[in-house]
Amino acid sequence: MPNFQKPFSGSSDGNSVMNDLGNKVAIKVFDCRSAQDGSEEQNVNVTTNQMYLMFQSNNYNVPPPNYNTEDLGSQGPPTHAYYAPFQHPIHLQPPVPPVYKNNTYSATDQYSDSSFPNTSGHTPVIDSNYYNDALASIPTTTTGSTTMTTDNGNTIDSEEYIDNMEVFSSEENENIDNVKQTDLKSEKDSSLLSAASIVKKEQLSGFENFLPLSKTESPLVTADEIKSSLNLENIDNADSMSFKLKTSPIRKHFHVKPKRITRVRTGRVSHNIIEKKYRSNINDKIEQLRRTVPTLRVAYKKCNDLPITSRDLADLDGLEPATKLNKASILTKSIEYICHLERKCLQLSLANQHLSNDTRDSFVHLTEPSQPLSDNSSSEQVQKQTRSCQRQRQRQPRQQQPLHNIQYNIPHQNGLMSGTNNSHDMDFNNAGDF
């Protein structure tokens, strides 16, 4: 409540103020303590270096007008105006919790409280950035800072608190992930241990036997639950242990999956092996045909730019080399060569039979006994010999005629040739090759 002072005197000052305020209506203002009693009226002093406001009925910074002022009588000249200096309303702002600034780990969405530090230690955070004392008084807000008083009498200024926090956070951001080791007995009074991170499975070395195994899912386990289940309060200070807290959660019960045993199908595997052997055997036989048949052998040398010898050309015996070396061409040329060999064997057998007949006739003629001939008998014998020689000469062309006209019903595929070879063109020097 503003302190009202004595009224000022003089009509010139009052008139000038009234002229500045325009046509607004002035209202007399009284002190609440004196106006209610009706004993004294205190006017408002007007100075030039202050900001003033003509109190209207909608201004709640002053007490309501006293409608019983007419009974008090005239306390001053009617030309006096009553003003009160304008003061800004006082708004008590609630204290803003300190904001932790961590440049290294800027992402704090994983924490429920954005002001909670991103630390990897399991112990309470002993940091000047976080003041843990309880407040004993209501924080008072001024224009520039907020002052708070704690139970132990410490006074905290918001500006100094924020400045110290920024300096400390800039120096300690690099080492904030280091694990701090403290006694386990002091962890009972820690208020941040229950809200800390979760213990990782790998850090519980030596305590796996205490955790039961199950195949079902279960909630997460915290450091407090592990400490209470292991009875770590009874451990001496010399044997104190520290757990490295991580942000990654673990399961209280570990899921054990049995290894899958694969069955080997012996029947299917054996069938595949048999098919593979069968295919490899067929390929080997086809390769042998390619190396044996002259037409295929010459075609293989042409495809691979290998030299072709005169023996290869003689083995062709009038046949054309193959144009392709696929399985169908190899089988076709093999059939063609087999038919050619059959035809050649027949020709050779007929020639051998003809030679054997000639040698037999000449041998019989030489073995006949010589007899004395008379004139009549000698002439008859000469005629018989001449007739026999003529018959033999006539018989020889008739026996050679089928050798030139032997035809076989062989399909003319891929350059197959009919048997039109002459007995005069046969090479008996290469007969041993067949």
Curated annotation (Swiss-Prot):
Post-translational changes noted in the entry: Phosphorylated by the cyclin-CDK complex PCL1-PHO85.
Domain of life: Eukaryota
Positions with biased composition (Polar residues): 368-382, 402-423
Pfam hit, one: HLH
UniProt keyword terms in alphabetical order: DNA-binding, Nucleus, Phosphoprotein, Transcription, Transcription regulation
Broad class of the protein's primary localization: nucleus
Region described as Disordered: 365-434
Cellular compartments per GO CC: chromatin; nucleus
Keyword rRNA processing: no
Localisation per UniProt entry: Nucleus
Molecular function per GO: DNA-binding transcription activator activity; protein dimerization activity; RNA polymerase II cis-regulatory region sequence-specific DNA binding
Entry protein name: Probable transcription factor HMS1
